[in-house]
Amino acid sequence: MVKRVFYIFGVCILSVMIFHEFEKNTPKETAENVAVFKESSGDPKEKLEKTAYLTFDDGPSEITPDILDTLKNKKAKATFFLVGNEITTEREQIVKRELEEGHSIGVHTFSHKKDEMYCNEVTFFEDFNQCRERIRQVTGILPKLHRFPWGSNNGYVCPIVDDLLAKLKKENVVSYDWNVSGEDSVGQNVPKAVIYKNVAKDLEKFDQPIILLHDSNSTKNTSKVLGEIIDLIAEKGYSFGTLDEREEYTFPQSWRK
């Protein structure tokens, strides 16, 4: 009986010594160690940084100053995809202001006429380059961001979109679709509550949502509800970024019409 007690006692002492030695030689989980682990773990379940990308198509317009005022007041950034023939002499200062206040700008189209720009590769790049050059004339910058009117999966561009994307990449131009839409251009002045609801229903499905909104005279309610949308995004824990900070995103090929 005594031998058995000593045996059990000895096993306990040995276990304590082994644990102490293991603990002594194991690096502490400092904040630095944790950060390195998170960066290099490669775990696909790991959350990406929550950054939202507000984007506005079809400007500049008469509501662009209101959009910029709201973004400035809310300390949010955005990306504007511009229409070349909307950059009138009177609106040149608006485009300059977009850049001055830390936003990004990209090419949308010059004409926004599908029957002209999507006829073939030649007509597409004529339209693209005309818009790009107009932006350069005003800002001195040749934009590197681009968005296809109606998205990269629309039926007009589908037959040639892969070739267009390849040629754009050779020009160091990056194209972006979206994964959240306010659906603010489906009709004339869509109600504010509808735009807000459309953004809210899909926002949290993504760690890096690209949010499609419009900057045009027929989407005036977008500028009126923008402050509430920005508040919602911030409340959900997102910061705001511009698309020049994000990798390319285009719709999957399976979505093409």
Predicted regions span which residues?
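Terminal accessory/targeting
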Residues: 1-53, 69-78, 206-257
